[in-house]
């Protein structure tokens, strides 16, 4: 499939916490959709190796959720560095979307962009500067059409690939119920 400028890149990161100055990326996943939100391809899901010191510094919430999901064990067993994740992700994306044209798509994507800017700037540069942030749409729906909110439920697995799939489904839901386009 040729790279298409109208395709959208969806990304999700799992991190050891919320502060890019001290916390690290431990998982990355990407999906490419067409402009109608149809999934065209799922990229690699990469657990990124981090030191025991980095993992031990996680707060209780992250220890619990990433422990229960098995992500901590996958991170410990992983041979992938941040650089490996950058290279594999860009190789995947370049097959579907030219550099610099797709907004970064996802939920609370500004947070992911902060971590990419700090630890994976080459990958962050692959995106257009604009974002398609499903959480912004959700906040508007909560205020303008609160009755619509109960119609979509997420699993909340905090697994990168599942989170992206849910974000795409959530935006489809809002498009159908709110935007009607």
Curated annotation (Swiss-Prot):
Enzyme class: hydrolase
Keywords assigned: Cytoplasm, Exonuclease, Hydrolase, Nuclease
Record EC number: 3.1.15.-
Any one GO molecular-function label of the UniProt entry: 3'-5'-RNA exonuclease activity
Cellular component annotations (GO), alphabetically ordered: cytoplasm
UniProt subcellular location: Cytoplasm
Stretches assigned to the Exonuclease domain: 8-171
Disulfide pairings: none
SMART domains: EXOIII
Gene3D superfamilies for this protein: Ribonuclease H-like superfamily/Ribonuclease H
Active-site residues, record numbering mapped to chain: 129
InterPro entries in the cross-refs: Exonuclease_RNaseT/DNA_pol3 (IPR013520), Oligoribonuclease (IPR022894), RNaseH-like_sf (IPR012337), RNaseH_sf (IPR036397)
Main location: cytoplasm
GO biological process: DNA metabolic process
Pfam families per record: RNase_T (PF00929)
Role played: 3'-to-5' exoribonuclease specific for small oligoribonucleotides.
Family: Belongs to the oligoribonuclease family.
Name of this protein: Oligoribonuclease
Species of origin: Shewanella loihica (strain ATCC BAA-1088 / PV-4)
Lineage: Bacteria, Pseudomonadati, Pseudomonadota, Gammaproteobacteria, Alteromonadales
């Amino acid at each position: 499939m040729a790279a298409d400028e109208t395709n959208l890149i969806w990304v999700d990161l799992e991190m050891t916490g919320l502060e890019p100055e001290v916390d690290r990326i431990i998982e990355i996943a990407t999906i490419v959709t067409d402009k109608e939100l149809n999934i065209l391809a799922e990229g690699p899901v990469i657990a990124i190796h981090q030191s025991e010191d980095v993992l031990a510094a996680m707060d209780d919430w992250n220890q619990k959720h990433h422990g229960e999901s098995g992500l901590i064990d996958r991170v410990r067993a992983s041979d992938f560095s941040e650089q490996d994740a950058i290279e594999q992700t860009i190789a995947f994306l370049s097959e579907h979307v030219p550099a610099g044209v797709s907004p970064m798509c996802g939920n609370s994507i500004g947070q992911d962009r902060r971590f990419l800017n700090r630890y994976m700037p080459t990958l962050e540069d692959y995106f257009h500067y604009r974002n398609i942030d499903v959480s912004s749409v959700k906040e508007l729906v909560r205020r303008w059409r609160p009755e619509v909110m109960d119609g979509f439920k997420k699993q909340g697995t905090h697994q990168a690939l599942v989170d992206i799939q849910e974000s795409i489904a959530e935006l489809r839901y809002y498009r159908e119920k709110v935007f009607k386009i």
